[in-house]
Amino acid sequence: MESIVKLKPEEFPEQLLEIPQPPKTLYIRGKLPPKDHTYLAVVGSRKYTSYGRDICEKLITGLKGYPIVIVSGLALGIDSIAHRAALKAGLVTMSFPGSGLDNNALYPRNNTALADEIVESGGCLISEFPPSMKAELYT
């Protein structure tokens, strides 16, 4: 497993420091994608329809070959579908799980292999939570 690095505010992306309450610390596993890429956030339901899945996969597959980074959470549903479609299309992804980045803390547990694949494919996982913190109701 790729090591987890603690970033200080001076290492954060500039835009993150412009929000009203930026995190004091960020943890990253993997490497940040190139800054000159376009970042596309994908969000959706955990309880998706077959139509939602098909459209998500089709849209992301159509981005193959472009300098685009797919950004999403690590939840079941559209988040996971977006990451898998992006990886299949050769795109880099970034994931923001609602937990720490240790495999023992990642939620849902059945997405630890997906998290590893994201990192191994040149993407990253980012969290403001300490590495061993498990997901809670509102994280």
Where are these regions (language model features)?
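Glycine-biased, small-residue-rich flexible motifs in mid-sequence functional cores and linkers
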Residues: 1-139
